[in-house]
UniProtKB/Swiss-Prot annotation:
GO molecular function annotations of the record: proton-transporting ATP synthase activity, rotational mechanism
Protein known as: ATP synthase subunit delta
Organism of provenance: Exiguobacterium sibiricum (strain DSM 17290 / CCUG 55495 / CIP 109462 / JCM 13490 / 255-15)
Subunit note: F-type ATPases have 2 components, F(1) - the catalytic core - and F(0) - the membrane proton channel. F(1) has five subunits: alpha(3), beta(3), gamma(1), delta(1), epsilon(1). F(0) has three main subunits: a(1), b(2) and c(10-14). The alpha and beta chains form an alternating ring which encloses part of the gamma chain. F(1) is attached to F(0) by a central stalk formed by the gamma and epsilon chains, while a peripheral stalk is formed by the delta and b chains.
A GO-annotated cellular component: proton-transporting ATP synthase complex
Annotated Gene3D superfamilies: N-terminal domain of the delta subunit of the F1F0-ATP synthase
Sorted UniProt keywords: ATP synthesis, Cell membrane, CF(1), Hydrogen ion transport, Ion transport, Membrane, Transport
NCBIfam families recorded: ATP_synt_delta, PRK05758.2-4
Membrane topology: Peripheral membrane protein
Keyword Ion transport part of the UniProt annotation: yes
Amino acid sequence: MRDHVAGRYAKALFDLALEHHVLDQAEADVRTLGEVLHATPELASVLENPSISAEELKQVLQTSFTGFNTIVLNTILVMVENDRASEVLSLPEHFIALLNEHRNVATAIVTSAYKLSDEELTNVKETFGQKSGKTLEVENVVDTNVIGGLRVQIGYTTYDGTIETKLTRLERELLKA
């Protein structure tokens, strides 16, 4: 349920930020919110604590995020007023997903046997950016179970060029013959 509700608030925030031409400021504020919530588990606990009143929560949030754009801060406060304080924890993830979709940006998770160099990551970014038609942000995940090659996941699409997969395909072909 949390994801669904947080997604609706994120969409409303995104639409308002776009309409008022403050998308970059909203992005910065929402990223900061996500970082603060991640770095301060105490604040996350406060948001999930039903025994803390909405007024107390609003005071804490207004004090903590005074420099935030009014639209971002008001969205968070409305969530608290509507008894959705715990949903604030998922707001950054949903907002950034909407922003990336709007900007035609996707995350490519590149799994390899070793940490790839910047040059290798740039090559992956360019090659798979062309295939997907998106601007890619690349994350390199090292998996020691990968013998060699790469596995690239962009959204729900996986390009598997690992040696293990190639050997499995070869085995199937040989068994057919």
